[in-house]
Swiss-Prot record:
UniProt GO MF annotations: aminoacyl-tRNA deacylase activity; ATP binding; isoleucine-tRNA ligase activity; tRNA binding; zinc ion binding
Gene: ileS
Positions of disulphide bridges: none
UniProt keyword Coiled coil present: no
InterPro entries hit by this protein: aa-tRNA-synth_I_CS, aa-tRNA-synth_Ia, Anticodon_Ile_BEm, Ile-tRNA-ligase, Ile-tRNA-ligase_type1, Ile-tRNA_ligase, M/V/L/I-tRNA-synth_anticd-bd, Rossmann-like_a/b/a_fold
Cofactor: Zn(2+)
Entry remark concerning the domains of this protein: IleRS has two distinct active sites: one for aminoacylation and one for editing. The misactivated valine is translocated from the active site to the editing site, which sterically excludes the correctly activated isoleucine. The single editing site contains two valyl binding pockets, one specific for each substrate (Val-AMP or Val-tRNA(Ile)).
Reaction catalysis annotation: tRNA(Ile) + L-isoleucine + ATP = L-isoleucyl-tRNA(Ile) + AMP + diphosphate
CDD domains: Anticodon_Ia_Ile_BEm, IleRS_core
UniProt function note: Catalyzes the attachment of isoleucine to tRNA(Ile). As IleRS can inadvertently accommodate and process structurally similar amino acids such as valine, to avoid such errors it has two additional distinct tRNA(Ile)-dependent editing activities. One activity is designated as 'pretransfer' editing and involves the hydrolysis of activated Val-AMP. The other activity is designated 'posttransfer' editing and involves deacylation of mischarged Val-tRNA(Ile).
GO cellular component, one term: cytosol
Name recorded for this polypeptide: Isoleucine--tRNA ligase
SUPFAM superfamilies: Anticodon-binding domain of a subclass of class I aminoacyl-tRNA synthetases (SSF47323), Nucleotidylyl transferase (SSF52374), ValRS/IleRS/LeuRS editing domain (SSF50677)
Pfam families: Anticodon_1, tRNA-synt_1, zf-FPG_IleRS
Length: 941
């Protein structure tokens, strides 16, 4: 009768499932996390540790989250969790940006414009309610990603206390002398009816008219004299400008030239024109005239204050000097309309040029505009061209495709328009230079971010912080009705209003009667009707939120982390405000990630049909697969995602999960309190495996500390697939399954597996949070009660390295891995040739040089367990048969023959020692010892 020895084996057993089934299991885990107040438990466990503060850049409270939101929140969550594991107290307070035009437009669509069907106060309340609904919707999706934070107490820019603190930040800006009021060209959206911040402007291709325009000289004789060209040439004499915005011609008040450039008086066909010397040929070619003659040359400086007739109005304009004039294109003479261009405005101010003020808020010419009254600016383009042709001052017209500013919300072209606005001055109190100095104190990740934001700060205009909107934090200022000067008690008044807003929200300002605060001054002072730019809202959260939340304990902010578009947006507005109020940058480190594109590198769009939504990914693959994709992608560039890429992430996930499952299954019955083996008593290979885990942990900790999450994933995969899966875990199966359950040989192995599992689950937790939690619940209990959640724990402290006196050190095992790899290669050839079925069916002879012979001999009879064959002979390389193929590893050669021995049904090894025990005639001697004896002894493997 055949005896079944299966029950004498230590077969792996665990309730940890092979399949993750993440999409189904994760929601239940989330429910458990929140029912048990996991975030608060992390806070309690971290109390008193050194702080690391990552301040959440608030997403806009409108619409569903997209894949870019998911990337951003997951990266933040990985950092927060890894910092906790590294021993920091790292709170996470999520936030939302709640004021501004997109919400206004949505609410307008629902209830109509304010002061039409609904009062402004009711409209603001509807905006507040709409924003709150949007926050709740986005919050659920963020939580589903596995992001841990104080979701019950997020910061909202529309919270009454935050609105009040935003007003207080404005007070600090004023106190430090950075605010001024001026009429200045700002980005103006005709659809919004409001100014736009730099970050709200996108550049898209647009087809515009391209025109060359004549400005006839007031005195041709005077110009001839300047060029020393009296009596030379013929025809009328004009300055030529080029523009792609014909509608700005009615507002022209000057022609700008560069003082240092050379200008020519040119005979161009039958007329004389002034052009920059470098551009004469290109202009002649553009207007289609071959006959040109240079009549004279002067520096731009010599043309200053020469006068030319406006092309179609009855006044003359001066030539002025400006450094912004270049020879990159055009004519070298720049049409200057101070209302409609920042350079024009700046240079116009130096010459005291008048502002035309011809374009109203809705983008139409005012009623007194000759020829174009009531026309929209873009509607006026062909009319201006027609007028220029009519009066004979159009030299050339054509179409040009060029990059043009558009509103990021409406995707429509915008204009520059001078309006009375409130500004934070970049030059007042040295703000620009101070900000540039602060940038150098910050660590920028990746480092090119520093040069990028430096260039932006160097070139940015004064910040227009006022908006003409209904739903926003009001600029709670009182100005003199005639002089527009701020009230002398502005700072005290701001604080009084802030207290009211703290109690009742921003509506408290709109409900306020001036007399309540101003008394008799109400006769001469009025309330400013403007609201603050929403970038002021979010840009001030370093103060309005972080400085006031008890969790942050007054600490400085360590990190801002957002997409690379935020150099121009949140990073910029925060830097400007913090420098203006506190003379320092608000952050120590700034990390930026790239945009998400499809597998072909294309931007996601509905028209292409390549949009990947986080909701779909989680429903199909689960949150951990999405998290693993984020972590494994180099975030410093564009982040590619597609179904195929996510499937690859799922494959990687399975390898990690299978490793964890193997560990747990082989820890079945292991009680660390009872069974843990001291390092010095462990089998050599087990000590090496723990040391290998320590090396991996050190690299993983360093990668987490430097935000190199793709390196974490690569190291995790190498550990699971190569060092463990392809080597250690493969080798120990025999010892784990066949030795006596409580033998030192097996307990040594389980001790190593336990240490590795304790470390592995912590490495995974910041990235594969759901799976780490699942593993944590299946780990054996320790002497002290195991913490309820892995997320409260620091990286594992129980790993140990190899001692200096360790003979079988890491270098030894690395050499052995090479030998094993070569043996496996030869075994594979034999398998493919049908000479053997598996490695245990083989008897291997290794012909080795002296170095390798000494190396292999150290394992004695246990070498076969490392090579996973039934028998190994070691011979001198000089004995290698002549017909044996050379090895790919220099210094050894390998031959394989099929074993003629019998197969043991218990361990599957082929052995000459089967039948040594009459009671167990089918077992090999080793299995007899393990079944009825004291158990097999292992020293090395």
């Amino acid at each position: 009768m055949t005896v079944d020895y299966k029950n004498t084996l230590n077969l792996p057993e665990t309730s940890f499932p092979m399949r993750g089934d993440l999409a189904k299991r994760e929601p239940d885990m989330l429910k458990n996390w929140y029912e048990k107040n996991l975030y608060q438990k992390i806070r309690k466990a971290s109390k008193g540790k050194k702080s690391f503060i990552l301040h959440d850049g608030p997403p806009y409270a409108n619409g569903n989250i997209h894949i870019g939101h998911a990337v951003n929140k997951i990266l933040k969550d990985i950092i927060i969790k890894s910092k906790t594991a590294l021993g920091f107290d790292s709170p996470y307070i999520p936030g939302w940006d709640c004021h501004g035009l997109p919400i206004e437009l949505k609410v307008e669509g629902l209830v109509g414009k304010p002061n039409e069907k609904i009062s402004a106060a009711e409209f603001r309340q509807k905006c507040r309610e709409y924003a709150a609904e949007q926050v709740e919707g986005q919050k659920k999706d963020f939580i589903r990603l596995g992001v841990l934070g104080d979701w019950d107490n997020p910061y909202l820019t529309m919270n009454f206390d935050t609105e009040a603190n935003i007003i207080r930040t404005l007070g600090k800006v004023i106190e430090n002398g950075h605010l001024y009021k001026g009429s200045k060209p700002v980005h103006w959206c005709l659809d919004c009816g409001s100014s736009l911040a730099e970050a709200e402007v996108e550049y898209e291709d647009k087809v515009s008219p391209s025109i060359y325009v004549r400005f006839p000289a007031e005195s041709a004789d005077e110009i001839e004299a300047k060029f020393s060209a009296q009596g030379r040439g013929q025809g009328k004499l004009s300055a030529i400008i080029w523009t792609t915005t014909p509608w700005t011609m009615p507002s022209n008040r000057a022609i700008a030239v560069n003082a240092d450039l050379e200008y020519n008086l040119v005979q161009l066909g039958d007329e004389r024109v002034i052009l920059a010397a470098e551009l004469v040929e290109s202009v002649a070619k553009a207007v289609g005239i071959e006959h040109i003659e240079i009549l004279g040359s002067v520096k731009g400086d010599d043309l200053e204050l020469s006068r030319f007739h406006h092309p179609f109005y009855d006044f003359t304009v001066p030539v002025i000097l400006g450094d912004h004039v270049t020879t990159d294109g055009g004519t070298g003479l720049v049409h200057t309309a101070p209302d409609h261009g920042l350079d024009d405005f700046i240079v116009g101010k130096q010459y005291d040029l008048p502002m035309a003020g011809l374009v109203s808020n809705d983008g139409k010419f005012i009623s007194t505009t000759e020829f174009f009254a009531g026309k929209g600016v873009f509607e006026a383009n062909p009319l201006v061209i027609e007028k220029l042709q009519e009066v004979g001052n159009l030299l050339k017209v054509e179409k040009i495709k060029h990059s043009y500013p558009h509103c990021w919300r409406h995707k429509t072209p915008i204009i520059f328009r001078a309006t009375p606005q409130w500004f934070i001055g970049m030059e007042t109190q040295g703000l620009r230079q101070q900000a540039l100095g602060e940038i150098k104190q910050v660590r920028w990740i990746p480092d090119w971010g520093q040069a990028r934001i430096e260039k932006m700060v160097e070139n940015r205009p004064d910040w227009c912080i006022s908006r003409q909107r209904t739903w926003g934090v009001p600029m709670t200022l009182f100005v003199h009705k005639e002089t527009e000067e701020l009230h002398p008690r502005t700072l005290d008044l701001l604080e009084e209003v802030a207290k009211r807003v703290e109690r009742a929200g921003i509506q408290a300002w709109w409900d306020l009667d001036e007399k309540e605060l101003l008394g008799a001054d109400a006769e001469t002072y009025r309330k400013v009707p403007d609201t603050l730019d929403v970038w002021f809202d979010s840009g001030s959260t370093y103060s309005s939120v972080v400085a006031n939340r008890p969790e942050f304990n007054g600490q400085n902010i360590d990190m801002y982390l957002e997409g690379s578009d935020q150099h121009r947006g949140w990073f910029m507005s925060s830097l400007m405000l913090s420098t203006a109020t506190d003379s320092k940058a608000p952050y120590k480190q700034v990390l930026t990630h790239g945009f998400t594109v499809d597998g072909q590198g294309r931007k996601m769009s509905k028209s292409i049909g390549n949009i990947v939504t986080p909701q779909e990914v989680m429903d199909k693959f689960g949150g951990d697969i999405l998290r693993l994709w984020v972590a494994s992608t180099d975030y410093t560039g564009e982040m590619t995602v597609s179904d195929e890429i996510l499937k690859r992430a799922a494959d990687s996930y399975r390898r990690i999960r299978n490793t964890a499952r193997f560990l747990l299954a082989n820890l079945n019955g292991f009680d660390p309190k009872r069974d843990l083996v001291k390092p010095e008593e462990m089998v050599s290979l087990d000590r090496w495996a723990v040391a290998c885990a320590l090396d991996a942990q050190n690299e993983i900790k360093d990668a987490y500390d430097n935000y190199q999450f793709h390196t974490v994933v690569q190291r995790l995969m190498r550990f699971c697939s190569v060092e463990m899966g392809s080597f250690y875990l493969d080798i120990i199966k025999d010892r784990q399954y066949t030795t006596k359950a409580d033998s030192l040989a097996r307990r040594s192995c389980q001790t190593a597996l336990w240490h590795i599992a304790e470390a592995l689950v912590r490495w995974m937790a910041p990235i594969l949070s759901f799976t780490a939690d699942e593993i944590w619940q299946h780990l054996p209990q320790t002497e002290s009660a195991r913490a309820e959640f892995v997320f409260t724990e620091e990286f594992y402290q129980g790993l140990f390295g190899l001692g200096e006196d360790e003979k079988l050190d890491d270098a030894y095992w690395q050499q052995l891995i090479k030998v094993r790899s070569e043996v496996n290669r030869v075994l594979e050839i034999s398998r493919n040739n049908k000479e053997i079925g598996g490695g245990l069916e083989a008897e291997v002879t290794v012909y080795a040089n002296d170095e390798y012979r000494a190396l292999l001999a150290q394992l004695g009879n246990e070498l076969r367990f490392v090579l996973i064959t039934s028998k190994v002979d070691i011979k001198s390389l000089s004995e290698k048969p002549a017909d044996l193929a050379d090895s790919e590893l220099e210094g050894i050669a390998v031959s394989v023959t099929r074993s003629n021995a019998e197969k043991c049904p218990r361990c599957w090894h082929y052995s000459d020692e089967i039948g040594v025990s009459p009671e167990h005639p089918t077992l090999c001697a080793r299995c007899v010892e393990n079944v009825v004896g004291n158990g097999e002894v292992r020293h090395f493997a």
